[in-house]
Amino acid sequence: MESNDDRNLEAINASVGRLVWVRRRNGSWWPGQTLVHDQVPDNSLVGPKVGTPIKLLGRDDVSVDWYILENSKTVKAFRCGEYDTCIEKAKASSSKKRSGKCTLREDAINNALKIENEHLAKEDDNLCNLSGEEDSKRCLSGKEDEDSGSSDAEETEDDELASAPEQLQSSISSQEMNNVGASKVQSKRRRTPNDSEDDGTEGVKRMRGLEDIGKEQAGGIVEHKQDLDLICAVGLSDSVSNGNTIANGNKVCSPSSLKRNVSECSKRKNRRRQLTKVLESTAMVSVPVTCDQGVSLDCQGIYDSKVSGMESVESMKSVSVVINNNSDSTGVSCEDAYENVVGASHNNKAKDSEISSISVSAEDDSSDRLFDVPLTGEENHSEGFPAACRISSPRKALVTDLTRRCGRNSHNVFVKNEASNGSACTSPPASEPVNCILSGIEKNTSKWQLKGKRNSRQMSKKQEERRNVYGEEANNNSSTPHSTLYEVKIEVKASYTKPRVPLVSRMSELSGKAIVGHPLSVEILEEDYSNGMVMPPVVAKAKSLPKKNGKKQTTEKAKETVVACIPLKVVFSRINEVLKGSARQTQHRALPSAAKT
């Protein structure tokens, strides 16, 4: 049986922040904190003694006292349970205004509670760090075991395939593999709907702790093992039902099914990768395109255009290039001008990272131009270049900005369109003829898009009038280097206050009376001065109203602005007359009041 002193000592040692209750000489219990010998201040009145130093909280005037905790009955643990009511009262009174001697004791209790909370927070952080390190070590060890097991399984499968290629039979169909993989991918997407398909595991939208990372990694390993067990179980059931042979309990697959599985794995891997990494790994081939020499392209440099091999939902007016690998021709001839191909040139500039670029060498003398086209078609490629260049539905890829300003008023891509007439396009002498099949831009183009283009290219009548007044050209599409630009500084203030104008009193030279008012600055001009900027007459059109009693409504009313010069003497004479009239009115109003008094 443990004595009360031993229990008290254990409670003091287990106290958070080394907090204790100390009984003072007047009999009151005060919160304190045990110190280490190094923490004892040098200016303490009492020298070092045998025992443990304890400092009272909230009392700077009291020195450090030494107590023997094993035998002392004047020291108790802070959470011994006897003074919980005092702690609750101190918490409740911390938000209220207090006055008196009890405030010092309550402040000391609140100070002890702060120290306790700080130590608890530090201990929680240390526990989290330790648990996170242990989870990460476990995950790393699990990954190493899984990698070693998968490598051993691959080696055994390769040996079996090399030794007996004739006895290989497919035990797991590709459709079941697809179903299992698709169901697993859908379940993962349901768990994390914020993760995008292109980013994969890198596009996590929230911050996570070390514990969450360790749990997710361990959960991913368990799920992967469950998938492998499920696939093996399905293969065993199929082989038993179909009568396929199984050697030593291992599943045996055919070469065709293995190829399908490899291709499916590569596709899934590409889906999880970023678009930029996938485009960097895709092969590029140069396709020479010859244009007619009669068409003059008045270009001044190299223009960039973009081609994407993936479907774009946002691009409603794009063009796709489908390459058919069936012949050995190397040239494509384009002569006719095909309009409305560049439909989303400005909207697709922000997506340069998602689509691969096409380099166009546009020179005035040369007629051969090279286009770098990414190969995203079938796996089997024939020698040479693709046979047919087919421009199909405009939702597969983006071909934008091939020519920005070809000629003075042309924004078109020149393509030979003779497939509708049944004739083939011409090609260079060394290459065979190539059929260029052009399907038109979507017929169901909405009317509001066309109307928006017309409205953007036109200019309102008010803008034309204003530009004519100030001598500017009314050409909205001109972007020549001769256009002038003006820098206008605009200041926006939150609270605008008008400047205070003082009242000024002057003596009139005519009447000798005082004139009180605000000062006004007047600029004296020459006699022959005239303002050259006169606004044009504004024509106001009245709305058509129903005719009543045979009266005809006027449709136009002309209003002209007139600028006139008034002599300065006339202005001041008018001001004097107004001031005299106001003075007389004040005198008349003052007379009745004086009579009443």
Curated annotation (Swiss-Prot):
Residues 450-460 have a biased composition (Basic residues). Residues 134-143, 461-470 have a biased composition (Basic and acidic residues). InterPro entries: PWWP2-like, PWWP_dom. PROSITE patterns: PWWP (PS50812). Residues 166-185 have a biased composition (Polar residues). It holds the Pfam family PWWP. It comes from the Eukaryota. Residues 144-161 have a biased composition (Acidic residues). Residues 126-210, 449-482 are annotated as: Disordered. CDD domains: PWWP. Residues 16-78 form the PWWP domain. This is Uncharacterized protein At1g51745. It comes from Arabidopsis thaliana.
